[in-house]
Amino acid sequence: MTTRQSSFSYEEILICGRGEMFGPGNAQLPLPPMLMFNRITDISETGGPHDKGYVRAEFDITPDLWFFPCHFMGDPVMPGCLGLDAMWQLTGFFLGWLGEAGKGRAISTGEVKFTGMVTPKTKLVEYGIDFKRVMRGRLVLGIADGWMKADGETIYKATDLRVGLFQEKAG
């Protein structure tokens, strides 16, 4: 069994964002400012609640982040959709990390619950993605549950996050 890298620095994540980590035409992360985490602290193809693998990542929050001045003026809060997008980003990264081919695209999610907010006073956001299944057929599909914590308190939960890897048709 090949041992895969189990954590990634910001610089390594940017390599993935440039499409240089998993090869041309394969999974890549968005670049800043849409990249919603600074490091992957742990990734494994086993373990987690379903023993199908997991990802853990962190995002350093500073008051000067791009979304605070515009969402909302005088009442800054990180848009909830950005936290959800981070979960999809990490789900797609996992599929590429497994060595699966294709470009990653978010497909859907089951239920999303927001019970708190990220404000300029928040210091650290943590993400957890716990895989339930990876299907390998005409397309590769990852299905996972996710959570997001702000300074240690769980504030977002998402079930049945789905990301597919799509390969371009020849011709």
From Swiss-Prot:
Pathway: Lipid metabolism; fatty acid biosynthesis. GO terms for biological process: unsaturated fatty acid biosynthetic process. It is found in: Cytoplasm. Its EC number is 4.2.1.59, 5.3.3.14. The keyword Disulfide bond does not apply. It catalyses: a (3R)-hydroxyacyl-[ACP] = a (2E)-enoyl-[ACP] + H2O; (3R)-hydroxydecanoyl-[ACP] = (2E)-decenoyl-[ACP] + H2O; (2E)-decenoyl-[ACP] = (3Z)-decenoyl-[ACP]. The active site is at H71. GO terms for cellular component: cytoplasm. SUPFAM superfamilies: Thioesterase/thiol ester dehydrase-isomerase. It comes from the Bacteria. One of its GO terms (molecular function) is (3R)-hydroxyacyl-[acyl-carrier-protein] dehydratase activity. The keyword Lyase applies. Keywords: Cytoplasm, Fatty acid biosynthesis, Fatty acid metabolism, Isomerase, Lipid biosynthesis, Lipid metabolism, Lyase. NCBIfam families: fabA, PRK05174.1. Belongs to the thioester dehydratase family. FabA subfamily. Necessary for the introduction of cis unsaturation into fatty acids. Catalyzes the dehydration of (3R)-3-hydroxydecanoyl-ACP to E-(2)-decenoyl-ACP and then its isomerization to Z-(3)-decenoyl-ACP. Can catalyze the dehydratase reaction for beta-hydroxyacyl-ACPs with saturated chain lengths up to 16:0, being most active on intermediate chain length. This is 3-hydroxydecanoyl-[acyl-carrier-protein] dehydratase. It comes from Sinorhizobium medicae (strain WSM419) (Ensifer medicae). The lineage of its organism: Bacteria, Pseudomonadati, Pseudomonadota, Alphaproteobacteria, Hyphomicrobiales.
